[in-house]
Amino acid sequence: ENVQDKIPNNFFDVIFAFHVIEHIQDPIAFIKQLNKKIKIGGMLIIATPDFDCAMARKYKDKFRLLHDPTHISLFSNDSLTSLINENGFKIDKKDFPYFESKWFTEDNLLKVFEDDIVSPPFYGNVMTFYCIKELDLN
């Protein structure tokens, strides 16, 4: 028996899934399982790299996050939005936290324009969605 089978459905008020979904073989089944475990009106907070961010488009196959072999499910803002909306959640807020971090400086921003072998870290490549469960898929 799996651990998640021991947790009753509609049990959690909030589930955090930070940098998990990009490592999941079947992200649709993963979101459906999260839907089962969150109460109606509860919140799913999910963060993952944005594989269609400005750095991914600029650096293409040299985008740093593509080189992690454990990143098997890649999402853009649009594809994650669709996955969430199609599985009983409404997106309350989207956040791109890099722009509010201590790393968002003029010096770091100028590095974006350097012709590096591989993309510099950060630069808006992470997205966090705050989602409200509206529909029970059980």
What are these regions (language model features)?
Residues 138:
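ATP/Mg2+ or Mg2+-diphosphate-binding catalytic cores
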Residues 9, 104-107:
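Short secondary-structure transition/capping segments
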Residues 97-103:
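Conserved PLP cofactor-binding pocket of PLP-dependent enzymes
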Residues 1-59, 72-89, 98, 116-117, ...:
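Conserved SAM-binding loop
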